[in-house]
Regions:
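Short, charged/polar low-complexity linear motifs in solvent-exposed/disordered segments
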Residues: 22-23, 46-48, 63, 83
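Juxtamembrane helix-loop transition sites at the ends of transmembrane segments
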Residues: 28, 34, 46, 51, ...
Length: 89
């Protein structure tokens, strides 16, 4: 699994970055931390998309990718901020 952690100062850029992660199957664990299923194709695609965002980063912005063995991961608490679907009839 890949853990993506980011600190982006601009609200609009941060929101767009979050939407991009979600559209690539990322699950929000905390406000600026996402979990992504790891395959070479997904990782290559994700890195390419992050590089397009990185061109617009300021000196205060950062994105860190962690390649984590899910069998060695320990989670405490229930801090998963998944968006709930809303359905209108």
């Amino acid at each position: 699994m890949i853990i993506v952690s980011y600190d982006i100062s601009d609200d609009k850029k941060r929101a767009n970055f979050s939407k991009m992660l979600k559209s690539n199957g990322a699950i929000r664990l905390q406000f600026s931390v996402y979990e992504v299923r790891n395959t070479k194709r997904i990782m290559d695609n994700l890195v390419a998309k992050i590089e397009t965002y990185a061109k617009h980063f300021t000196a205060d912005d950062s994105v860190i990718l962690f390649d984590v063995d899910s069998d060695k991961l320990t989670k405490y608490g229930n801090a998963i901020h998944r968006d709930q679907a809303i359905v209108y009839f």
